[in-house]
Amino acid sequence: MCDVDLKTCQKSSKFKKKDIVELGKQCGVNPYLSNGKEKSRTVICTEIVASYNPPPGSSQGDDSEHESISQVNNIPNRNEKFLPKSKYPTYTQVLNMEKRQLKALAKKLGLEYKKQTEQQLQGAINLKIKTLEGLNSSTRSRSPSVRSRCRSPSPRAPSVRSRLPSTRSRCRSPSPRAPSTRSRSPSVRSRCRSPSPRAPSVRSRSPSRQSVRQSSESADEAEQVALETMKTAHLRMLATTLGASTVTGMKKKDLIDYIKSRRKSPSPSPVPPSTRCDPTTTAPPMEDLFKKKVDELKTMAKNAGFVRWNGKTLSKMNKSDLVDFLLNGMNRPSPSLPQSRSRTRSPPPPPRSRSPSVGSPSVRDGGAGRRRLPELTRAQLTAMKVVDLKAMATELGLTRYRGMNRTQMRKGDVINFIIETQKKQKTPSPSPTPPSPVPSVVGSRRPKSPLPYKSRDFVALADDDSEPGVEVQKKMGKSGEREPKSVPNVRIIPSEIPAPTEGSLRSRLSTQQQTQQSVVYEDPNESIKPEESVRAPKLSVVDPQLSRKTLKPLPSLVVTDQPSKQPELPKYKGRTPYTDLEQLAQSKGYTVKQVSGDGNCLFRSVCKSIRALRGEKFTHRQLRQMVVDYLRENPEFLQVYLEYVARQRDNSLPSTEQYLSEMSKCGTWGDLICLKTLSEILKVQFNLLILNTKQFQMVSSQDDYPDVIPLGYIDNYHYTSLVPIGLDSKGGAASSTTTGLKQLDGPRPPITLIPESQVPAVAATISTQQPPSIVAPPISVGGSQLVPSIVPQPQMPKPDFKPVKPLSNLNELLDLMDRVKPQVYNDISQLEKARQSIKVSLGL
């Protein structure tokens, strides 16, 4: 029955699927897969025919290990996860395959082949084949049968066919006269070879020892392939978990060798018997463990008999610790790093406390009473959890750091504390010396970075000029937190700051204003700050060769989608911004009205300018609330600017409600959106005098608004109020210093339209019974010419205009209009009064 033809077995209608399965069982072929499902009809028939109908002249039979790759790829798709043992390609054949062949083979083996490189496919396929071969070898090793093969080269040596229920022998003779006899057994297959026809020798192999050796070799090769396919970052993490102190400079090959050495030579530290598992249990590959979730790893650890590992319970184990336990803690003791070699006796170890699992057991520091932990890089500390970092910082003696306690510190603050503490432990402590007084900055010492215009850190300089040095004091709030930032950090080069002169604006400042501390950005670089005033530091000669390049100020306005976050500020290269702006404004015909830099400078400056030019009174809180209310009622007005900011910065669209909630807070910086909104609400145009470009820039929602409000703008961080020269805070007209107009010493003379000598006599009829009436004199008309009876002769002086250079751009024209507009408005009002007087005198 088993000598059936392949074509007959596959296509004969008398054989159904269940008949083929029964036939396979009778012929010694396993018709089931490893997962319990039945093999396909074609595969069962192929195994039956290949086992019992070998082709004539074949010397290797069905166990040939040199099958072509095309035969491997031609396996039917109905049974993709099954490959006969003899169809596995070798390691060299897999390396020589093309990528499409590797994908087809990976698909048949049930592996992931999409978006995989050629090297990843080769490693995964070799690992899968080694695993399948190890399973097949372990299955065969558990069988108590002996497989031997007998061959009789002599044509006269007859081979006897015997049917035994438990043994299976196969003899082949190349002679056509020697009938082949087969012994059939569903579980045992033996082959014997006899070099002589009369003395057949049976060579038996011990499958148990061979299978154990083969499984161990396949496990080592599978581990090597898995380590080669892993990323370098994962290898470094695994090496750190296994006890490596420094993995920064190690290459991938060195990492693999270290991991394999740790796997082969575990630490001899004792392990509780409850954590030991069955020695026959093999740990899963490292790559598969890292792909699993933490919950799955915890379940595997529970099944493996987990109690404690490296002093941690299961709830405190992270992913790397779980992988370390599953790789090393199931069959062997817990690995630990070797302690630092020292000739002196180490004190007894302190009681175990919650500490990170990275690094070796800590050693107590000399007389400091703290435990010295191994030095870790910033990358290793970043990979740790915040709880472990805080535990390590507590062991290093953390009480307070930069005004923050342990609960207020974030992950970055804890990492900075650990790194600074490690540096202090690394450097030897110097001998105690008496404290020296803090000297002042003298000589030719150059500061390492440009001076900040205003800074959170102010400097108290001593009077001793022996040695250069500074003493920095932190300005903290009542609760220990840093105060909010309101004024940006504008750096000033000290070599360009002149000493204050008598009569200047700087010398007129009060002592309280000069010594007032300001709250701004904290400069991370080391710098030298002014002594008494943020505007006039007293510094001596500096070295120009040590000057640093500074950033240019931004000439344009800043639009921000997060008002609470101050923009990055440029470095100011001028002398003092307020003095320079005052000089620039005076050259343009304006007076600077300073406002406080508390974050409300935009709204305060608009209040002052509106009050001076139009007489309307507002507070900065009212203007801020008006802006927020208008944007809430008109969200489309705000959405356009937020979309523009999102496109320019290539980030997600900010929330309108988030912007409004931040802008409604007092002290939040105003931006271009607020200026546009105020222009729409107040129906005015804002003319910004920018200190950096020394030019005016018009900002308005519409160009047809008649009123223009000038403002001063200092390098993207501060607004001031500008008032035309001659106007006080109440909006009244005063003496004018407009360029191009002659200034009058006294008050403007009254306009006289009709001289007193030529005033005509007007006869009025006035009685008590009738209302008074004004009768104009008759006008004599002679010929075609009309002679007026009243000849006005005004006595206004002619204005003396100086020669004006031709205008070059629109900004100069707007500047000229701003200077002439107050004078013209005054003249127009006087002309209107004269017109009314003429009408009254003529009786109209």
UniProtKB/Swiss-Prot annotation:
Locations of Basic and acidic residues compositional bias? 472-485, 526-535
* Catalytic residues identified in the record: 598, 601 (nucleophile), 718
Which spans does this entry mark as compositional bias, Pro residues?
429-438
Hydrolase in keyword set: yes
Origin, by domain of life?
Viruses
Q: Where is the OTU domain?
A: 590-725
Task: State the CDD domains in the record.
Answer: OTU_232R-like
Q: What does the record give as EC number?
A: 3.4.19.12
Keywords from UniProt, A to Z, are: Hydrolase, Protease, Thiol protease, Ubl conjugation pathway
What does it catalyze? Thiol-dependent hydrolysis of ester, thioester, amide, peptide and isopeptide bonds formed by the C-terminal Gly of ubiquitin (a 76-residue protein attached to proteins as an intracellular targeting signal)
**Ranges where the record places region Disordered:** 136-223, 261-287, 326-377, 422-541
Positions with biased composition (Low complexity) = 137-216, 332-341, 354-364, 504-518
Q: Does the keyword Protease apply?
A: yes
Name the enzyme group at the top EC level. hydrolase
Q: Which GO terms describe its molecular function?
A: cysteine-type deubiquitinase activity
> GO:BP terms for this protein?
DNA-templated transcription termination; protein deubiquitination; proteolysis
Describe the function of this protein.
Answer: Hydrolase that can remove conjugated ubiquitin from proteins and may therefore play an important regulatory role at the level of protein turnover by preventing degradation.
Q: What protein is this chain from?
A: Putative ubiquitin thioesterase 232R
Source species of the chain: Invertebrate iridescent virus 3
